[in-house]
């Protein structure tokens, strides 16, 4: 019976996380961690480690799918990733100096708001409009935005994927598919760094839960990424919006229940 419960929890956690990753470049930690903590009574630190591990492969397979469909800006993605990683460390150091408050609710609320935004005001930027920005300007923007995202993620400890999607579409004027593709590409490496450090500090995870979460998240992320790359911009905006709103509401309910 215990295995059935584990199977169901990891299946739905992986499904939510995978769809969020494949459609919107959302971090799996936002979905998987609260479910493992609530239903399987797992240690929060371990749950986050498993969620980040699930993120690595799911983000990698999504990035590969987006890249294959020419919806990935690797050059600026690498520039942004360098500043995100560097300033995540600065952000977490700054967070250790101030009184600790849980800011997890902030990222959940942001997920919900971002979902509403995609439904109400779809991102209809085209690749042609993106090409109009000079390479130098885009590189500078990538560094500045990476610093901002990294610092906030390190300080709050969450919301990286959503923050990136928001900034790529709103500030940098990316077309939605390229924004998600670039976001999951960066997240593959940030999640890997996080997962390795979690297990280095916290020890080995529960092998069954770990394997199931990674597998289910990977499968659903692949499904979502394939659909996202075939869909028209309007359909994709709606689908992304709906997925984010549902996930936002579900996670908020979890937080209330626990």
Predicted regions and their residues:
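Juxtamembrane transmembrane-helix boundary motif
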Residues: 1-19, 33-39, 44, 65-151, ...
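Hydrophobic, membrane-facing alpha-helical anchors
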Residues: 1-6, 10, 53-64, 158-168
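Transmembrane helix-bundle signature of multi-pass membrane transporters/permeases
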Residues: 18, 48-56, 180-191, 244
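Transmembrane helix boundary and interhelical junction motifs in multipass membrane proteins
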Residues: 23-32, 157-167
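Membrane-interface alpha-helices at helix entry/exit sites of multi-pass transporters
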Residues: 42-50, 75-76, 173-184
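A small-residue-rich subset of transmembrane alpha-helices
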Residues: 54, 182-198, 208-221
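Short, structured loop/turn "capping" segments at alpha-beta junctions
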Residues: 126-127, 158-163, 174-178
């Amino acid at each position: 019976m215990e295995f059935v419960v584990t199977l169901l929890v990891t299946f739905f956690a992986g499904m939510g996380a995978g769809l969020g990753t494949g459609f919107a470049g959302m971090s799996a930690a936002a979905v998987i961690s609260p479910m493992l903590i609530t239903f399987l009574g797992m240690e929060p630190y371990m749950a986050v480690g498993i969620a980040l591990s699930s993120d690595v492969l799911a983000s990698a397979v999504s990035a590969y799918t987006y890249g294959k469909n020419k919806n990935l800006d690797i050059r600026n993605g690498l520039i942004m990733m360098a500043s995100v990683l560097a300033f995540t460390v600065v952000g977490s150091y700054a967070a250790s100096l101030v009184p600790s408050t849980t800011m997890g609710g902030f990222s959940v609320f942001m997920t919900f708001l971002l979902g509403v935004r995609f439904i109400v005001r779809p991102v209809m930027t085209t690749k042609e409009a993106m090409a109009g920005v000079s390479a130098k300007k885009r590189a500078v923007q990538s560094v500045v935005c990476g610093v901002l995202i990294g610092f906030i993620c390190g300080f709050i400890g969450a919301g990286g994927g959503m923050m990136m999607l928001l900034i790529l579409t709103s500030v940098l004027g990316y077309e939605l598919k390229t924004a998600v593709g670039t976001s999951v590409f960066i997240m593959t490496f940030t999640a890997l760094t996080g997962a390795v450090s979690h297990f280095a500090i916290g020890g080995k995870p529960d092998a069954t839960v770990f394997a199931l979460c990674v597998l289910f998240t990977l499968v659903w992320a692949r499904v979502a990424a394939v659909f996202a790359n075939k869909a028209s911009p309007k359909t994709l905006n709606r689908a992304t919006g709906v997925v984010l709103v549902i996930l936002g509401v579900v996670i908020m309910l979890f937080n209330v229940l626990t």
